[in-house]
């Protein structure tokens, strides 16, 4: 074997090798001898098939296995010459040449190595952080909302007319072209008027009705309605209002605190106000971080933390971004790229900057997570996906299986780790008094959230 290895920088190396055809043919014989005892061909007993016939019948598999063996040997020797271990190899080598000549094979490949990352400029990267402290007005607004949310619905007198925030029990049936349609009928159906549980025009038609009253009204389904067979159609609805219930107002006092903080001993309005203030602070913090500071922190990390990146990983990320773009493109756009190799190359190349930044930030986050011992358990990933399923009306098991099938669970975990690392860095840069608010909130993290 004739091998040359050149280290380009701390994260990249290039190898070129020449291997004799004779070397490869010897591998063919060894592999054929290895599989021969398991081969069964009509007319021969198992294990008694002539080696020449095994090599002919399984030529493609034998050649592939031999080439893979040869590649692994080349890589092993290249790493040895570089003085690095296999665990320091990143991703798969990118073979730029694999040619068979008359007497030998010529191989050239780019190798990605684990980058060396120095985290001495992290403090310079973290932007100044100042979260808005909730004022009395905001606290009072949330207390009023809590009083409303926890209020029970009670029966009303027969003369009451339906108004927003009332709970109605109705029977209804819809017709299109004088015929009932699927999903257009229900009995003893409950809805909160004004909650947008039903179409806005449907709820508006119920305003002012009294218990026992019946009503007919036309309704046009939106052109973008989720049920395609109803989108844009004109319907006639017949509704009977069975019952109206109104919220029984709750006073903002210690009794409300005991209801909201049911898991707390000796809950008081003072304690509830403290919890509300803390919850509002956390919401303000999350909004500031997600809408502004995390992105600023990422930009600073990208700019100030400098190290060599493995080019093979950048190329793989470009491939991923290019494939994702193809999935979201119109058929005409995909066809245009298929017909022009030059256009396809240009499109793929347009993702280089994004791919480079993505790879770089991933390496930085991984290094920070290890240094600060920040991780995410698999169960937390599943909980996140369960929540996503609930919010989107999907089956949790099906959603998790979909992520698993598409090898996306690792990406979800990495995104969660990134979020925790960025939050950790920003939290450390909070003013002292705001860090104290956070510390005060942590013992109550598992208790009832307010609002």
UniProtKB/Swiss-Prot annotation:
<dbReference type="InterPro" id="IPR046357">
    <property type="entry name" value="PPIase_dom_sf"/>
</dbReference>
<dbReference type="InterPro" id="IPR036611">
    <property type="entry name" value="Trigger_fac_ribosome-bd_sf"/>
</dbReference>
<keyword id="KW-0963">Cytoplasm</keyword>
<dbReference type="GO" id="GO:0005737">
    <property type="term" value="C:cytoplasm"/>
</dbReference>
<keyword id="KW-0132">Cell division</keyword>
<dbReference type="InterPro" id="IPR005215">
    <property type="entry name" value="Trig_fac"/>
</dbReference>
<keyword id="KW-0143">Chaperone</keyword>
<dbReference type="InterPro" id="IPR008881">
    <property type="entry name" value="Trigger_fac_ribosome-bd_bac"/>
</dbReference>
<dbReference type="GO" id="GO:0044183">
    <property type="term" value="F:protein folding chaperone"/>
</dbReference>
<dbReference type="Pfam" id="PF05697">
    <property type="entry name" value="Trigger_N"/>
</dbReference>
<dbReference type="InterPro" id="IPR037041">
    <property type="entry name" value="Trigger_fac_C_sf"/>
</dbReference>
<dbReference type="GO" id="GO:0043022">
    <property type="term" value="F:ribosome binding"/>
</dbReference>
<dbReference type="InterPro" id="IPR008880">
    <property type="entry name" value="Trigger_fac_C"/>
</dbReference>
<comment type="function">
    <text>Involved in protein export. Acts as a chaperone by maintaining the newly synthesized protein in an open conformation. Functions as a peptidyl-prolyl cis-trans isomerase.</text>
</comment>
<dbReference type="GO" id="GO:0051083">
    <property type="term" value="P:'de novo' cotranslational protein folding"/>
</dbReference>
<dbReference type="GO" id="GO:0015031">
    <property type="term" value="P:protein transport"/>
</dbReference>
<dbReference type="Pfam" id="PF05698">
    <property type="entry name" value="Trigger_C"/>
</dbReference>
<dbReference type="GO" id="GO:0051301">
    <property type="term" value="P:cell division"/>
</dbReference>
<feature type="domain" description="PPIase FKBP-type">
    <location>
        <begin position="165"/>
        <end position="250"/>
    </location>
</feature>
<dbReference type="InterPro" id="IPR001179">
    <property type="entry name" value="PPIase_FKBP_dom"/>
</dbReference>
<dbReference type="GO" id="GO:0003755">
    <property type="term" value="F:peptidyl-prolyl cis-trans isomerase activity"/>
</dbReference>
<dbReference type="GO" id="GO:0061077">
    <property type="term" value="P:chaperone-mediated protein folding"/>
</dbReference>
<keyword id="KW-0697">Rotamase</keyword>
<dbReference type="Pfam" id="PF00254">
    <property type="entry name" value="FKBP_C"/>
</dbReference>
<keyword id="KW-0131">Cell cycle</keyword>
<protein>
    <recommendedName>
        <fullName>Trigger factor</fullName>
        <ecNumber>5.2.1.8</ecNumber>
    </recommendedName>
</protein>
<comment type="similarity">
    <text>Belongs to the FKBP-type PPIase family. Tig subfamily.</text>
</comment>
<keyword id="KW-0413">Isomerase</keyword>
<dbReference type="GO" id="GO:0043335">
    <property type="term" value="P:protein unfolding"/>
</dbReference>
<dbReference type="InterPro" id="IPR027304">
    <property type="entry name" value="Trigger_fact/SurA_dom_sf"/>
</dbReference>
